[in-house]
């Protein structure tokens, strides 16, 4: 059963052209290969290529790119998030959750807490810990609303929370 109907136009933005978040799986997915390829060709940010390779399911290549990028910018939160996402995509879900919990401890009370909670929710959802995913998504949404975040981020958190609650209700 599709959570949102009507094609991909209602899917939340994933933060890169041509990529949106599948509202059923809550995983980023390429929805327009041409747009994605053009944006990637124009980008000079190594994080963009890492993200696209992750979305494509190429975790090993993403990990190699990440190692080089982290060497040049070891404290980058975005790159540390990619490290945990690589673990998630590689089905090392417990390790991904542990790393996101560590990042959460480091970002609690900062503007970055919401993005970490959103990613933590995604890892919980992927691991089947739906109750924890609901909690993480709810807190991410609360923080984004309280912080007057971009509407696209609030929408992404709303869709993720609704989907996680729906799945939780199915399993209850």
Where do the protein language model's features map onto the residues?
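A conserved position within tetratricopeptide repeats
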Residues: 37, 70, 104-107, 141, ...
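N-terminal alpha-helical interaction modules that lie
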Residues: 1-67, 71-73, 89, 169-172
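Structural signature of alpha-solenoid helical repeat junctions
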Residues: 41, 75, 112, 152-156
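"A position-specific structural signal for the A-helix of alpha-solenoid helical repeats
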Residues: 48, 82, 119, 126, ...
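Alpha-helical linker/edge segments of TPR/alpha-solenoid repeat scaffolds
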Residues: 92-95, 128-131, 159-172
């Amino acid at each position: 059963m599709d959570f949102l109907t009507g094609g991909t136009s209602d899917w939340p933005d994933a933060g890169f052209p041509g990529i949106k978040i599948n509202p059923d799986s809550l995983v980023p997915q390429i929805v327009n290969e041409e747009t994605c390829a053009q944006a990637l060709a124009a980008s000079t940010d190594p994080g963009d290529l890492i993200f696209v390779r992750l979305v494509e399911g190429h975790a090993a290549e993403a990990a190699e790119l990440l190692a080089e990028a982290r060497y040049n910018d070891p404290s980058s939160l975005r790159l540390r998030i990619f490290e945990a996402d690589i673990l998630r995509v590689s089905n090392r879900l417990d390790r991904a959750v542990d790393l996101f919990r560590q990042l959460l401890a480091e970002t609690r009370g900062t503007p970055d807490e919401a993005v970490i909670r959103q990613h933590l929710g995604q890892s919980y959802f992927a691991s089947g810990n739906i109750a924890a995913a609901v909690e993480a998504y709810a807190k991410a949404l609360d923080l984004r609303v309280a912080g007057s975040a971009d509407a696209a981020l609030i929408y992404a958190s709303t869709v993720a929370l609704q989907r996680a609650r729906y799945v939780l209700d199915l399993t209850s």
